[in-house]
Curated annotation (Swiss-Prot):
Transmembrane residue ranges: none
Annotated consequence of substituting residue 857 to P: Loss of interaction with PPP1R12C and PPP1R12A
Organism per entry: Mus musculus
Biased composition (Basic and acidic residues): 240-262, 333-349, 522-545
GO terms assigned for molecular function: actin binding
UniProt key word Metal-binding: no
Protein name: Myosin phosphatase Rho-interacting protein
Lineage start: Eukaryota, Metazoa, Chordata, Craniata, Vertebrata
Stretches assigned to coiled coil: 672-976
Spans annotated as Interaction with PPP1R12A: 823-878
CC terms in the record's Gene Ontology section: cytoplasm; cytoskeleton
PROSITE patterns listed in its UniProt record: PH_DOMAIN
One Pfam family linked to the record: PH
Location of the region described as Interaction with F-actin in the Swiss-Prot/TrEMBL record: 1-382
Length: 1024
């Protein structure tokens, strides 16, 4: 044991000898911790929208009391965990979890929070505060949650009797026994796979056949252990596939079998057993249950009623779209379905506390509250969950503006406020009346995910943040506006609850002891069974036969609800047994009404004279029997027609357009009124028939008295002839009465048949006229749409062509303006070039003048140089010649001449230097002029190139625009203008310099070429 404590067994595997113990550690199932697989496989048993107080809220602090409560979707699972998330989608991760197995108490929180309809869930860790919108919702949650603290307190008291406490106590809805097929089947998970098999119709037939094989119910299964058997029920009999009240109570006794004391099982651990336990319960001795007939026909009728309830359950499950809360019979596990195969109906489910069901021994509310699986089916369709929703949506107004509002769906309207604070202050911004809503569709909008609410007043466009929110709103509004699929809030009354569940919860003895007129004898049933065996369908059944019965039950429930609503308030406090007896009485009256048409019943007549008299006139009574049979067939057909009439108008698809919906609705209403009138006439006819049958019975009594008189006459008291005359008169009167009754009945049948044909003809004519009107409207609408589309296409084409033409004209004008600007620039450039050419010519002339002056200066300089050289040579000769001859005589004269010559030489040298400087300056000026000339020629070339490129580009643009204009003109069907000049400006006709611009381009080029060649030649000559 110490090793087991150190290494706890994490996986429960059932022991083959005791399936409530683990084969590894031999500890009970509840001592094993729940793993993730158990949590994911757990079934939700209750759920709904509630308001949760934020964490850390201290309601003793006035500041915290003004905090906003968070709206969350709460789900209570069968393992005792209460989880809450942002929405009701099953894929949404929960924001938090409250372990109800550790809950110590659930108390009213209004005193602490100051909020109505609030609860406080006390756990050892913290306190959780929840709040609902209405009293019914919070009462339902209180009833569901109070089970856990009570159970936890009971477990504390029973610690001496049961196993040691476990690390995690399972919830009251957690099962205690697993794996109905053996130990290996439960080894894969803590919740056995055998329990995952859904309840099907085949299991009901197997239970019926098993009950037939063991009618006495005294033998026990050999595989059953004493610890697996259940204590006997206190008051109610055990039924296969039907949950009894004893399953909800706490079993706390010790059973001794064979001198061994068996471990006591708590009530919430014994909710589910294996098939062997079920067989043990079914095979308990009859003294444990009240005596009731166990004929095969009664068993068959019970199974048929179970199948009808199962069909209704599945049909209603298909109509609901709540994926989390719906736990239909197809999803219940097989371990539970063996004890309770058919959940209670959810026709009038609500969150209000349910009244005690009609049973043989009604249990206390404390014991009834422990039926968590019963609440799992009743809470799957609650009025508050379907007909109440809040959230942020965006509404589109008539001017196209979008505005965000806080929407609240309640009653027959969709109200919207500025925010939730405005809702609490009743500051209403607007309201959408849903009483006339007939459809809610998705609508594509530019903002988020849109949908439209279609009403007679108009269409309202809303948008949600996500597609999931939009889908939830559409489903909620559709269920809200369709009263057949959404349950009525008034059904939360105890009377409605009793009426909705009376067919399933009535005891077996009451149903078996009801008289069923017209029931076939055992020989007929045997022959039918033989026929089915010959046809290969010994265990099959035609389920289409149950639909009229099931619809009749639904009609009876609706009529019962209507009568209870119109009755006095004292009817609400009626006992369940009285309601069940009232329902059985109505069912019996209806059967009698049909049974009286089958057989003309009367007291047993042992008088041989009467039998002789009836045998003497078989022809008189044979025809009435045949006619009454025909009448019975006709009435059965009429009832079948009434029962199969669809009662849910919202499920019918309208075939007429919107403007015909009012007429069709009025026609449909008139049809239903006529149907109700016909039903009333039929009931009146049936009453008259019963009165006539009563008269017939009185006549038969008179006939019996007459026969008695005849017998007395034989004894000598009355003459025989008098008796014979009285008997003949009585027989004639009786025959006339029967004939009158038959004729009256035939007339009524003819009248009903004619009325039916007339109604069918009117309905057919109305349908045909509606279809024709719809076709005509559709045809006219199509023609209007085609004309509108053609007109829009033509107008769009014309507007496109006109816009294209305007665009072309604008482009053409812009190009013309650009050409004018370019021509002006070209003229200015030409003027500048002319001025530059003139300046260049002046510079050339100045250069030539300078060159001539330079040449003259060079010649003068040469002449001076020659003269200087000659003078120097002369002086030298004079000096040399005179020096030899006159050196002695003229020294002073020679010195003077030499001085003069030196001075003259210096003067000449200075002149030469001045001339050289002037020549160099002239050379510099010439080089400067040559550079200016080169710069001017280069600039002229660049300007000319730019103007040529601009002119070529302008020519290309003009040609392209001409082509585009021509194409546009051809597209418009107009004749293109020929020979028209697009550009009214000639680039060669410039006003600024007309003489210069009129020259040919070749002449200008030639002149420029000559000027360039001349300048080059001069430059070369100058350099040389």
């Amino acid at each position: 044991m110490s090793a087991a404590k150190e290494n706890p067994c994490r996986k429960f595997q059932a022991n083959i000898f005791n399936k409530s113990k683990c084969q590894n550690c031999f500890k009970p199932r509840e001592s094993h911790l729940l793993n993730d697989e158990d949590l994911t496989q757990a079934k939700p048993i209750y759920g709904g929208w509630l308001l949760l107080a934020p964490d850390g809220t201290d309601f003793d602090n006035p500041v915290h009391r003004s905090r906003k409560w968070q709206r969350r979707f709460f789900i209570l699972y069968e393992h005792g965990l209460l989880r809450y998330a942002l929405d009701e989608m099953p894929t949404t991760l929960p924001q938090g979890t409250i372990n109800m197995n550790q809950c110590t108490d659930v108390v009213d929180g209004e005193a602490r929070t100051g909020q109505k309809f609030s609860l406080c869930i006390l756990t050892p860790d913290k306190e959780h505060f929840i709040r609902a919108e209405t009293k019914e919702i919070i009462s339902g949650w209180l009833e569901m949650l109070m089970v856990y603290p009570r159970t936890n307190k009971q477990n504390q008291k029973k610690k001496r009797k049961v196993e040691p406490p476990t690390p995690q106590e399972p919830g009251p809805a957690k099962m205690a026994v697993t794996s109905s097929s053996g130990g290996s089947s439960g080894s894969s998970s803590s919740i056995p796979s055998a329990e995952k098999v859904p309840t099907t119709k085949s299991t009901l037939w197997q239970e019926e056949m098993r009950a037939k094989d063991q009618p006495d119910g005294t033998s026990l299964s050999p595989a059953q252990s004493p610890s697996q058997s259940q204590p006997p029920a206190a008051c109610t009999p055990r039924e296969p596939g039907l949950e009894s009240k004893e399953d909800e109570s706490t079993i706390s006794g010790d059973r001794v079998d064979g001198g061994r004391k068996v471990r006591v099982e708590s009530g919430y651990f014994s909710l589910e057993k294996a098939k062997q336990d079920l067989r043990a319960e079914e095979q308990l001795p009859p003294l444990l249950s009240p005596p009731s007939p166990s004929t095969p026909h009664s068993r068959r009728s019970q199974v048929i009623e179970k199948f009808e309830a199962l069909d209704i359950e599945k049909a209603e499950h298909m109509e609901t779209n709540m994926l989390i809360l719906t736990t239909p019979s197809s999803d219940t596990r097989q371990g539970r379905s063996e004890r309770r195969a058919i959940p209670r109906k959810r026709d009038f489910a609500s969150e209000a506390p349910t009244a005690p069901l009609s049973d043989a021994c009604p249990l206390s509310p404390h014991r009834r509250a422990k039926s968590l699986d019963r609440r799992s089916t009743e809470s799957s369709m609650t009025p508050d969950l379907l007909n109440f929703k809040k959230g942020w949506l965006t509404k589109q107004y008539e001017d196209g503006q979008w505005k965000k509002h806080w929407f609240v769906l309640a009653d027959q309207s969709l109200r919207y406020y500025r925010d939730s604070v405005a809702e609490e202050a009743a500051d209403l911004d607007g309201e959408i009346n849903l009483s006339t809503c007939y459809d809610v569709t998705e609508y594509p909008v530019q903002r988020n995910y849109g949908f439209q609410i279609h009403t007679k007043e108009g269409e309202f466009t809303l948008s949600a943040m996500t597609s999931g929110i939009r889908r939830n709103w559409i489903q909620t509004i559709m269920k809200h506006v369709l009263p057949a699929s959404a349950p009525d809030v008034t059904s939360s009354l105890p009377e409605g609850k009793n009426k909705s569940t009376s067919f399933e919860t009535c005891s077996r003895s009451t149903e078996k002891q009801e008289a069923e007129p017209g029931e076939p004898d055992p020989e007929q049933k045997k022959s039918r069974a033989r026929e089915r065996r010959r046809e290969g369908r010994s265990k099959t059944f035609d389920w289409a036969e149950f639909r009229p019965i099931q619809q009749a039950l639904a009609q009876e429930r609706a009529s019962a609800v209507g009568s209870s609503d119109s009755g006095d308030p004292g009817c609400l406090e009626a006992e369940p047994g009285e309601l069940e007896r009232e329902r059985a009485r109505r069912r019996e009256e209806r059967r009698k009404r049909f049974g009286m048409l089958d057989t003309i019943d009367g007291p047993g007549m042992e008088d041989t004279a009467l039998r002789m008299d009836i045998d003497r006139s078989p022809g008189l009574l044979g025809t009435p029997d045949l006619k009454t049979q025909n009448v019975h067939v006709e009435i059965e057909q009429r009832w079948h027609q009434v029962e199969t009439t669809p009662l849910r108008e919202e499920k019918q698809v309208p075939i007429a357009p919107l403007h015909l919906s009012l007429e069709d609705r009025s026609e449909r209403l008139s049809t239903h009124e006529l149907t109700s009138l016909l039903e009333k006439e039929l009931e009146q006819s049936q009453k008259e028939a019963s009165d006539l049958l009563e008269q017939n019975r009185l006549l038969q009594d008179q006939l019996r008295v007459a026969l008695g008189r005849e017998q007395s006459a034989r004894e000598g008291y009355v003459l025989q002839a008098t008796c014979e005359r009285g008997f003949a008169a009585m027989e004639e009167t009786h025959q006339k009465k029967i004939e009158d009754l038959q004729r009256q009945h035939q007339r009524e049948l003819e009248k009903l048949r004619e009325e039916k044909d007339r109604l069918l003809a009117e309905e057919t004519a109305a349908t045909i006229s509606a279809i024709e009107a719809m076709k005509n409207a559709h045809r006219e609408e199509m023609e209007r749409e085609l004309e509108k589309s053609q007109r829009s296409q033509i107008s769009s084409i014309n507007s496109d062509i006109e816009a294209l033409r305007r665009q072309y004209l604008e482009e053409l004008q812009s190009v013309q303006r650009e050409l004018e600007v370019l021509s002006e620039q070209y003229s200015q450039k030409c003027l500048e070039n002319a001025h530059l050419a003139q300046a260049l010519e002046a510079e050339r002339q100045a250069l030539r003048q300078c060159q001539r002056e330079n040449q003259e200066l060079n010649a003068h300089n040469q002449e001076l140089n020659n003269r200087l050289a000659a003078e120097i040579t002369r002086l030298r000769t004079l000096l040399t010649g005179d020096g030899g001859g006159e050196s002695t005589g003229l020294p002073l004269t020679q010195g003077k001449d030499a001085y003069e010559l030196e001075v003259l030489l210096r003067v000449k040298e200075s002149e030469i230097q001045y001339l050289k400087q002037e020549i160099s300056s002239l050379k510099d000026e010439l080089q400067t002029a040559l550079r200016d000339k080169k710069y001017a020629s280069d600039k002229y070339k660049d300007i000319y190139t730019e103007l040529s490129i601009a002119k070529a580009k302008a020519d290309c643009d003009i040609s392209r625009l001409k082509e585009q204009l021509k194409a546009a003109t051809e597209a418009l069907g107009e004749k293109s203008p020929e020979g028209t000049t697009v550009s009214g400006y000639d680039i060669m006709k410039s006003k600024s310099n007309p003489d210069f611009l009129k020259k040919d381009r070749s002449c200008v080029t030639r002149q420029l070429r000559n000027i360039r060649s001349k300048s080059v030649i001069e430059q070369v000559s100058w350099d040389n």
